[in-house]
Amino acid sequence: MDVNRRIGVKDALLALLLALLQGCPLGETAPNASPLVGSNWGNPRRYVHLQTSTDMSNFYLEIRLDGTVRKSTARTSYSVILLKADTRERIAILGVKSNRYLCMDLEGSPFSSPTCIRDDCLFNHSLLENNRDVYYSSRTGILFNLEGSRQVFVVGQNVPQTSLFLPRTNTVPLERLLLHRDKRNQVVDPSDPHRVAVGRAEEGSDSRALQEDDADLEVETEVEVGDDGRNASRERLQAPSDHDPWGVFSSNPGSPRSSGTVG
């Protein structure tokens, strides 16, 4: 009798435990309130253009090869951005083509760096009620603004129009972003260091690749001329390393800072 009673108690406890588990699944967690931790954020395939606007036009954040941070009226290779989550609400903003991070100094002036400096290159992110994103320095709280004005972000306070951003889907073909990287990482044959034989064998395909790259530069030059009426800069083409895309292991990079005029 006692044995049957014990078995009955165990069965009742087991049934109660199963009911509790069904009501509160072990895998259930608090809802994720931050879009930065979503499956698309921080994914290398999730390239975007950060768009802001004035009453007259739309603009896009550009991070150039020479480190210049500026705005562009058109989507170009240098306006392709990767938002990389550091925490639920803190991100790094990487220019994919230039392989440089957006940063901000203590005065709120933007610059870029080939390495992610924690104090300067991490931004807090907030999604406002109007479905616009703002990015502000994790150290000073100063809003990133493509017009260059400086304001500390305060919840509920009016935000400058050019500090409000919309992530737009990337429209630049990936081969235009990765062309120089692929060329730089080609293995050199010791018996043909100047790649004469390879050049003859691939003359047709190589010339097509160069034409695509020239077209890419031509579009961006037209944007520069349209902004200020003259060619603002001439840049030396260089490529990031596939083995260290975040610049973590870069040794002695010199001064990582490269200031840029926003405008």
From Swiss-Prot:
Compositionally biased tracts (Basic and acidic residues): 198-211, 227-245
GO cellular component, as recorded: extracellular region
Pfam family, one: FGF
Disulfides per UniProt: 103-121
Biased composition (Polar residues): 249-263
Domain of life: Eukaryota
Spans annotated as Disordered: 198-263
Glycosites: 124, 231
InterPro entries according to UniProt: Fibroblast_GF_fam (IPR002209), IL1/FGF (IPR008996)
Intracellular or extracellular location(s): Secreted
Biased composition (Acidic residues): 212-226
UniProt signal peptide: 1-23
GO molecular function: growth factor activity
Alphabetic keyword roster: Disulfide bond, Glycoprotein, Growth factor, Secreted, Signal
Family, similarity comment: Belongs to the heparin-binding growth factors family.
The protein's name: Fibroblast growth factor 23
Organism (species): Tetraodon nigroviridis
